[in-house]
UniProtKB/Swiss-Prot annotation:
GO biological process, one term: L-leucine biosynthetic process
UniProt cross-references to InterPro entries, sorted A to Z: Acnase/IPM_dHydase_lsu_aba_1/3 (IPR015931), Acoase/IPM_deHydtase_lsu_aba (IPR001030), Aconitase_4Fe-4S_BS (IPR018136), Aconitase_4Fe-4S_dom (IPR036008), HAcnase/IPMdehydase_lsu_prok (IPR011826), Homoacnase/IPMdehydase_lsu (IPR006251), IPM_dehydratase_rel_enz (IPR050067), IPMI_cat (IPR033941)
Complexes and interactors: Heterodimer of LeuC and LeuD.
Family statement: Belongs to the aconitase/IPM isomerase family. LeuC type 2 subfamily.
SUPFAM superfamilies in the cross-refs: Aconitase iron-sulfur domain
Official protein name in the record: 3-isopropylmalate dehydratase large subunit 1
Pathway assigned to this chain's UniProt record: Amino-acid biosynthesis; L-leucine biosynthesis; L-leucine from 3-methyl-2-oxobutanoate: step 2/4
Enzyme class: lyase
Amino acid sequence: MGKTMAEKILSRASGEDAEAGDIVVANIDVAMVHDITGPITVQRLEEMGVERVWDPSKIVVLFDHQVPADSVEAAENHKIMREFVEEQGIEHFYDVREGVCHQVLPEKGHVRPGDVIVGADSHTCTHGALGAFATGIGSTDMAAVFATGKLWFRVPETYRVEITGELPEGVYAKDVVLKVTGEIGADGATYMAIEYHGEVVREMSVSDRMCLCNMAIEMGAKTGMVPPDEKTLEYVKKRAGTEGRPVEPDPDARYEAELTLDVSDLEPQVAKPFSPDNVVPVGEVEGIAIDQVFIGSCTNGRYEDLKVAAEVLEGEEVHDDVRLIVIPASREVYHRTLKDGVLEVLHEAGALICPPNCGPCLGGHMGVLAEGERCVATSNRNFPGRMGHRESEVYLASPATAAASAIEGEITDPRPYL
């Protein structure tokens, strides 16, 4: 019997002939913490009596959740991590200016096909878009990784998702992954690796594939993965200077479950409160009044996302009753959209453009919702209280749908604007 991508990568990293269900101890290629999970990791290391990390060149420390510091506590956490970085000689440290971890890691060449990547953040699964086995872990497990460079895994079963057909105009990767999430359900792929296949995926940019893999965790999955191809290798070689160790699933690999989705007639999708799998076509929620629109996050804060939003908003104005918050996912994205006029279009339409950060997505700052308020967001979660008050509501959508909704002051089909 052949192997899936997850089985192949964990076999290589553990030195064993690993199959789904096996328990293995794998060598870690990259370990990442941010400003919220990092201080807890440091505390656990101290409790374990560990004085030196296993390899300062394989650890990435990054600030993105509370940047600029939104409280004294956040500032103290930043200070703790800056001191830890200096003390341990951590080679890859990105302070408050660089952006959201799941955008910065691939940009800076820390994601390579075939790697085992762990991050103390649940959306680490994003990096499977480049052919890595990438998954989120807790701060205590991360402390063990910092100390030993190893971590145990139960090798996951794999859910094969094939996307066929051709995307209609006004329908994007976010609409596809929302539809997939609605089909599989919030716990339909629990602890599995989701492998994405099909001509639609092959036509997608690396950024769009990252959007697909980012929401694997919203289906309960351990990770999302896309088999590496020429686009992958071109991106990685440019960023990391190497093609990594790309693997593809064998033709006779065993899959726990399979889904084939023809997107030829797919409409823009929206996830209603209070779960990412509560997905309907935009027409079913069109006309619901909103107070805020958030375009950004590790799901949809990339260049292509902001460019689409600008295409919708060009020559238009944000509705008087709506706050449009735009947050590029990284300094690189910010710079590119600034240079080519995308941010100018968004600014002229009435958007509030913020520095790269995770703030509103986790209900931290730069866009927290009050009781009874509604937001259309391009992020990945809409649980009660996710973006602020527990009685607020979040509707998940593509950047195009979000931008059109900002113009109308209500949830809106973006296709007439394109």
